[in-house]
Amino acid sequence: MAFDFPDQFRFADSHEYVRQEAELVRVGLSAYAVDQLGDIVFVDLPEVGDDLSRGTSFGTVESVKAVEEMYAPITGKVIQRNEAVLANPEELQNDPHGEGWLLVIRPSELAQIEELMDSATYSAKVAAA
């Protein structure tokens, strides 16, 4: 299955994406990862105000197939979480790159974004998987 990964996104090896929005960053799970999980039944996210460290677990996503950890693609503070996805996890499945976003983070270092994969590199990675 072919996936369309937006050019303005950057991706972590663990399949989380970031989209910079001025001084904030929106974080979500890539369409590829969501597809691999199957039917999503539960999402656990950190609280607003929590500090995240790049590469450490910030929550879980549970599907009928598995429970997977999600990892912070960058370091920062949680400014907002998507309450709609918490209440209705199918939203993540329906539109992972849009309304199915997970968190908004105020990054400690915007430069960390550039260390993530661009959409072309990520697309090649998942195509080879």
Curated annotation (Swiss-Prot):
The keyword Membrane does not apply. The keyword DNA damage does not apply. One of its GO terms (biological process) is glycine decarboxylation via glycine cleavage system. Residues 24-106 form the Lipoyl-binding domain. Pfam families: GCV_H. Keywords: Lipoyl. GO terms for cellular component: cytosol; glycine cleavage complex. InterPro entries: 2-oxoA_DH_lipoyl-BS, Biotin_lipoyl, GCV_H, GCV_H/Fam206, GCV_H_sub, Single_hybrid_motif. The modification N6-lipoyllysine is found at residue 65. Its cofactor is (R)-lipoate. Binds 1 lipoyl cofactor covalently. The glycine cleavage system is composed of four proteins: P, T, L and H. Belongs to the GcvH family. The glycine cleavage system catalyzes the degradation of glycine. The H protein shuttles the methylamine group of glycine from the P protein to the T protein. PANTHER family: GLYCINE CLEAVAGE SYSTEM H PROTEIN, GLYCINE CLEAVAGE SYSTEM H PROTEIN-RELATED. This is Glycine cleavage system H protein.
